[in-house]
């Protein structure tokens, strides 16, 4: 299988007068990768996360309605710009819906595209587990390179040491150079994110992110406050 050219299609064969159906090898292998990345991304998904979709999203204000429509448009038009490296950057306080809409996008895209949903900590854990089988840069290049959409959950919610900083720079540099579409959500403010990404003497990562990602600021109150009030009041 490893020597099969990506776009090769098996020729039709005829046996006993019966045509054997043509098999598109590239589609078969791609579908295998879709399933593989769904399994890998499941490390970041809880049972209720799979229930998130645009249809059951409860919109609380006008700005959120606009954001929701924009996220739906991103999914519906993804094939038109997937090779350009454009993406989404969500920032705001905890509980404002960033992870919900990230999961909505993931759930809509995961069966059609090779989507890699992860966090920096989860990705670093993968490096440690696979280190020895291949170098860390080869592992990251392989893991990120096959993905058609990369989702990084809760960026900035980790304490990164020098080893991690070097890898963090490689991750984003590879994503930019390979023109990989990326979705990021974070609780950090712009000032905090700029400081977080100011690694290895490089202060350009945030500006590069903003240049390729549409910016969404979730600046409303925590929507989880009072969410279970009716149930709790029944006690």
Where would I find each of the regions flagged by the language model?
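Surface-exposed cleft-lining segments at the edges of enzyme active sites
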Residues: 58-60, 88-92, 123-129, 157-160
């Amino acid at each position: 299988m490893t020597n099969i050219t990506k776009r090769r299609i098996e020729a039709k064969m005829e046996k006993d007068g019966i045509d054997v159906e043509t098999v598109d090898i590239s589609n078969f292998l791609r579908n295998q990768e879709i399933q593989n990345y769904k399994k890998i991304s499941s490390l970041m998904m809880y049972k209720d996360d799979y229930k998130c979709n645009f249809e059951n999203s409860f919109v609380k204000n006008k700005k959120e309605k606009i954001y929701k429509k924009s996220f739906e448009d991103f999914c519906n038009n993804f094939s038109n710009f997937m090779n350009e490296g454009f993406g989404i950057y969500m920032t705001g306080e905890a509980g404002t819906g960033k992870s919900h809409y990230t999961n909505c996008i993931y759930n809509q895209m995961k069966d059609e595209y090779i989507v890699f949903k992860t966090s920096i900590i989860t990705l670093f854990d993968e490096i440690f587990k696979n280190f020895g089988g291949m170098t860390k840069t080869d592992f990251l290049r392989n893991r990120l390179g096959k993905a058609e959409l990369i989702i990084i959950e809760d960026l900035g919610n980790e304490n990164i040491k020098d080893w991690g900083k070097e890898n963090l720079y490689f991750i984003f540099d590879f994503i930019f150079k390979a023109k990989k579409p990326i979705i990021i959500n974070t609780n950090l403010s712009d000032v905090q994110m700029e400081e977080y990404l100011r690694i290895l003497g490089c202060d350009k990562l945030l500006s590069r992110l903003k240049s390729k990602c549409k910016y969404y600021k979730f600046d409303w109150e925590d929507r989880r406050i009072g969410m279970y009030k009716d149930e709790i009041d029944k006690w």
